Structure formats: C-alpha cells, structure tokens
Amino acid sequence: MLNKRTTEVYALGQHISMSAHKARRVIDQIRGRSYEETLMILELMPYRACYPIFKLVYSAAANASFNMGSNEVNLVISKAEVNEGTIVKRLKPRARGRSFAIQKPTCHITIVMKDISLDEYIDTDSITWSQKPKSKKKHTTMSYYDMYSNGGTWDKK
C-alpha cells in the first residue's frame, strides 16, 4: 500500500469588502491557469477585485514553497471559488432627519494551488476490474403506417 502525497495548498481570504459577483468575474479568468500566467493577468486587468485576488494567489504560492518545497513554475490553480460573506449594514443620513440603509457586501475567496510535478500514488491492490454483463440488443420492427385507411387527418367530413 502506497501513501498519498499531498500536492495541494490553499489560501483563504475572508471578509473582503466587495461583491461576490464582481470577484467572480476575475476568478473565472484565472481558474486552471499557471501561477506565472495568473500574476500577469491580474496585474493587467483593470478591476478593483484584482488586488486582493493577487495577494491570495501570491500567498498560496508562498504556502506551497514553504510547506511542500515546490517550485513556483510547477504551480497551477486547481480550484478557485468565491462565496458570499456577511453584509455590513450602515445608515446614511438624509434630508429632514431621515436615514437610508446602506448594505456593504463582503465575500470569501479561496484559492487552491496544485503542484503538477508531484505525482499522486494510488494503491493498485484495491482496484478491482469488473466487466459489465453484455445485454441483449432489442430488435425493433418497423411497420408501415397508412394514415388514409384508419381515419387519418383527411377522413373528416
């Protein structure tokens, strides 16, 4: 039996003050890309969400190099997700002594990086190969349908 080697590290950013919808717009562009390509994309995109995501990707790469000793060239973003956080509620004073509620959304961003140079070992003794029983093919016969002889659409008077 062989042990499974850990090849994934993650970085988690919680309570980031921006909408989850705006952060997902950036996350969808970097999912599945390499580390160096991701940094270039995040530096050149004109969105406000890029900076906290850039910091998380950089932190996940630092976790990978410190915990696993992996090289940054071999890192790929295997999973990136954005979840909605709590909504911070504030009051804005308005005219004639009134106040309006302001809702400031937050989000939680998770970046999971995988080292593609490390192989995962699988125990081959526990895998059993089984064949599915072959099913008999059903033969269908086609019959000619005559719509004029049994009261079709033109038989009405």
From Swiss-Prot:
GO CC annotation terms, alphabetical: chloroplast; large ribosomal subunit
CDD domains recorded: Ribosomal_L22
Keyword ATP-binding tagged: no
Main location as per UniProt: plastid
Keywords for this protein: Chloroplast, Plastid, Ribonucleoprotein, Ribosomal protein, RNA-binding, rRNA-binding
Annotated GO biological process: translation
Alphabetical list of SUPFAM superfamilies matching this protein: Ribosomal protein L22
Gene Ontology MF terms in the entry: rRNA binding; structural constituent of ribosome
Location relative to the cell: Plastid, Chloroplast
Recorded coiled-coil stretches: none
Taxonomic superkingdom: Eukaryota
Database matches in Pfam families: Ribosomal_L22
Subunit relationships: Part of the 50S ribosomal subunit.
Family: Belongs to the universal ribosomal protein uL22 family.
Primary role: This protein binds specifically to 23S rRNA.
NCBIfam families reported in the protein's UniProt record: rplV_bact
This protein's name: Large ribosomal subunit protein uL22c
